[in-house]
């Protein structure tokens, strides 16, 4: 799947041309200092703790957990190894997330060790000689796992007149912003040095460790009666006490398999433009329309009259904009579909997304701590990511990398969430990360085809078509959905949810 100049694919589908590999890893002295680093009082962020727990739980089942963010960019010319060594070490010393490693003592006790002096981090280049595409991929995904300090590595693949720069970083220390801000940082520092200029001054990097402190101060003040916590509890209780599962079969989870990524074009450029117009006519944005289409597609595949989804949100503050780290929260989305038109569904989906934005600051694991009857997110919970390269901040990234080949790759291991990624540039495409087995592949193929079918119908003028009623709701489930939907609406919103409620809402969002 391509989003502007950025190609999103599985690493097995990446075919870098053979070349001489030079990779950067820490010196033995750096590794020794990291291993001796004292315990820090700063806990991991909630999303870091989730990654460490899920990695360990999957390993105990004999499964290889997906963990790496891999990004690459093609560069003309020969790599100046001395300049690149400087840039890599400057990057690692600039961002304090790289000074930490984590020790899992038990499921509820994860300890951070922290390197005091950033100068103790030193990466040096190693030349490996000519490698084939397959050998290159194997080397890049062999970056140490989440329980090692050096769970990040960098390299270049040198060819006659160009090279590929890559970064292979454990998600503990990076999120999708690295593909833009991180690569831009590398590019600007490297370009200045090879042009004979002194090292450039970069914007203040901020501190991921400070974010972890702020997050735990905020979550410690929450109670079971906090409105954001109550909203999460309401959502979880209607989904068996946790995040919603993907609604189609995914095969036997006890059978070991890797992960794969399946992509499909949803709409061409003209259809995308018409679809956006349909969203605007429904008083929704593109993301509201996409969530509506996913909800309708799930209804057509399963008969589910209400879609429950999770979508991630970057929770950086303005002070964190240049900070390297994992700043991802989740928003719960509730979208009734039965008996409604696309216009109504898209507007409800948009309202649910917008009014749920504050919930991204509340990690679900904290909600589970406050309400122990709930359960932490289970493997293969359903997650929907949306990337719009027509608006900021992605629009700036696409302009920056215009004319270059930029890639970001899944590492081919078992995914924890089942992630649906929808990307919009001129065209609109979707990719799904899923367990690589025949049952899951069949389900994901049907799922993507259903989404494509709905999107095309809307783009071709089918906004007035109403979704048929399929399954009647039990009284208890009806009450829960009614409560969830009212919570997701603003004053004045008109709701026509099948036979549940018809009202012009005059209550506030916490009613």
Curated annotation (Swiss-Prot):
Key word Cell cycle present: no
UniProt feature coiled coil, ranges: none
Chemical reaction(s) catalysed: a (hydroxy)phthioceranyl-[(hydroxy)phthioceranic acid synthase] + 2'-palmitoyl/stearoyl-2-O-sulfo-alpha,alpha-trehalose = a 3'-(hydroxy)phthioceranyl-2'-palmitoyl/stearoyl-2-O-sulfo-alpha,alpha-trehalose + holo-[(hydroxy)phthioceranic acid synthase]
Stored SUPFAM superfamilies: CoA-dependent acyltransferases (SSF52777)
Class of enzymatic activity (EC top level): transferase
Gene Ontology molecular function terms on file: acyltransferase activity
Protein name in UniProt: 2'-acyl-2-O-sulfo-trehalose (hydroxy)phthioceranyltransferase PapA1
Organism: Mycobacterium tuberculosis (strain CDC 1551 / Oshkosh)
Name of encoding gene: papA1
């Amino acid at each position: 799947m391509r989003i502007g100049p950025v190609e999103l694919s599985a690493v097995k589908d990446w075919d870098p041309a053979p070349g001489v590999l030079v990779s950067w890893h820490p010196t033995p002295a750096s590794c020794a200092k990291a291993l001796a680093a004292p315990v820090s009082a700063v806990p991991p962020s909630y999303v870091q703790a989730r990654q460490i727990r899920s990695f360990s739980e999957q390993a105990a089942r004999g499964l290889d957990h997906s963990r790496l963010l891999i990004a690459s960019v093609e560069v003309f010319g020969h790599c100046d190894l001395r300049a690149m060594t400087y840039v890599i070490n400057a990057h690692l010393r600039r961002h304090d997330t790289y000074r930490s490693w984590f020790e899992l003592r038990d499921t509820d006790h994860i300890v951070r060790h922290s390197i005091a002096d950033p100068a103790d981090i030193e990466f040096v280049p190693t030349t490996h000689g000519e490698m084939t595409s397959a050998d290159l991929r194997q080397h890049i995904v062999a970056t140490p796992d989440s329980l090692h300090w050096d769970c990040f590595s960098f390299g270049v693949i040198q060819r006659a007149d160009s090279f590929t720069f890559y970064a292979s970083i454990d998600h503990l220390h990076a999120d999708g912003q690295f593909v833009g801000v991180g690569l831009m940082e590398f590019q600007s520092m490297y370009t200045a040095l090879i042009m004979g200029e002194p090292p450039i001054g970069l914007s203040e990097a901020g501190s991921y460790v400070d974010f972890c402190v702020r997050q735990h101060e905020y979550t410690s003040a929450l109670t079971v009666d906090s409105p954001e916590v109550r909203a999460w509890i309401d959502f979880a209780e209607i989904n068996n006490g946790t995040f919603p599962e993907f609604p189609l079969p995914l095969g036997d989870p006890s059978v070991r398999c890797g992960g794969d990524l399946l992509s499909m074009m949803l709409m061409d450029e003209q259809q995308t433009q018409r679809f956006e117009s349909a969203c605007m006519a429904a008083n929704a944005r593109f993301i509201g329309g996409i969530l509506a289409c996913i909800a309708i597609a799930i209804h057509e595949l399963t008969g589910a009259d209400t879609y429950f989804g999770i979508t991630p949100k970057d929770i950086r503050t303005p002070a964190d904009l240049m900070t390297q780290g994992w700043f991802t929260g989740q928003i719960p989305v509730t979208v009734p579909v039965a008996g409604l038109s696309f216009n109504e569904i898209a507007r409800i989906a948009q309202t649910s997304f917008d009014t749920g934005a504050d919930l991204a600051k509340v990690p679900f694991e904290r909600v589970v701590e406050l309400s122990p009857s709930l359960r932490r997110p289970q493997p293969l919970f359903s997650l929907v990511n949306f990337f719009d390269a027509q608006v900021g901040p992605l629009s700036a990234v696409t302009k920056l990398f215009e004319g270059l080949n930029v890639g970001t790759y899944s590492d081919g291991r078992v995914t924890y969430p089942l992630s649906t990624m929808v990307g919009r540039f001129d065209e609109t495409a979707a990719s799904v990360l899923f367990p690589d087995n025949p049952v899951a592949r069949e389900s994901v193929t049907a799922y993507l085809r259903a989404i494509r079918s709905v999107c095309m119908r809307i783009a071709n003028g089918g906004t007035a078509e109403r979704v048929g009623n399929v399954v009647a709701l039990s009284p208890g489930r009806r009450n829960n959905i009614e409560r969830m939907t009212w919570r997701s609406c603003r004053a004045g919103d008109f709701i026509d949810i099948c036979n549940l409620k018809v009202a012009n809402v005059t209550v506030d969002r916490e009613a």
